[in-house]
Amino acid sequence: QTDSGRDGSICGYLQNHVASVFAGTLMTAFSPLPLYRLCGIVWFFFPVLACLLASPVRDRTRTATDVQRRTVSRYAREIFAFFDENVSHKTHWLPPDNLQLSPAECTAYRTSPTNIGFYMLSLLAARDFGFIGSAVLAERMGQTIGTVSRLEKCRGQLYNWYDIKTLRPLGNRYISAVDSGNFVTMLVCVAAGLDEYSHEDIRLAELAADCRSIVRDADFGMFWNPKKHMLYLGCDGEGKPQGSICYDMLMSEIRTTCYWLCASGRLPKKLWQSLSRTITAENGYIGMVSWAGSCFEYFMPELFLKREKDSFIDESLRFALSGQKHHRKNGIFGVSESGYFAFDPDMNYRYKVHGVPKLALKRYPRGEFVV
């Protein structure tokens, strides 16, 4: 609200917009032309309209029931169990990429910056849920941060994949803008969370400082395209852009990175403004499309960004949720990057991006369906 109607009442708006009421009265009473009289009526009722438009939207958020809370807690415990059981000294306290149980049982002993960041967040979430104490949080977080500090980097950025048994980068050294951004923004959240528990274990304050040091050392200038005001997809092992393609859509997993880079002053605000906002409509909703139409692109950034109610991003998320619900099979919905029914020579599931065609710019083959 503006200062002119700061008490929020109609009387307050009338008191501070007397000139509008007076001018509207004169125009309505004495103007010879109907158009002027109509303008006078609008001016007369302007304070009332301004008050109604400035009033807060009623919050329709529902409080979770006890049953829902227990269900969420059970899901959280099962998710944390993956990290708890698979992260150890054998993996240098880094999480494996995935665990496959059939048709061949195997563990993918590789990891990425996003995987590492989510593991660190899972430790913090486990403390929030009460699954572990602050001492265990400090011990395990310290072990992982210690390993991260030893990993080979380029200008403070982690490479895209590491062998967690040898800690060496895998394949041709490559630095992904979105993976690097995910990791750094997750560390920002982790540091804030560790501060909340630092009174219970002094080591947590030191670990929060270590997280901020890693964030501070990460150079995102290598991804910046000054002509397009966007981020390159990634860079080679020497920090040079690979190709000319940039992340150019707001409904993308890069949204978190772009928001933080602009908010922290690392890169110009033009970055946020340059992201495409291509609009479409479906099932009574209007919203922005993404490249692949996946849940990951729309909803993953919302783990970290506050969603402003009734904003265009909020409407686009509702649009995406509606599209995902309509793209269901046997009541199950939610399509994103995942494994699918195809195998490599070692009988490992292949992995690629999947999405809802009506939410995507990408074209999908007919009959392809994954949930």
Segment roles from a protein language model:
Residues 2-49, 54-371:
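Ser/Thr/Asn(+Pro)-rich, low-complexity disordered segments
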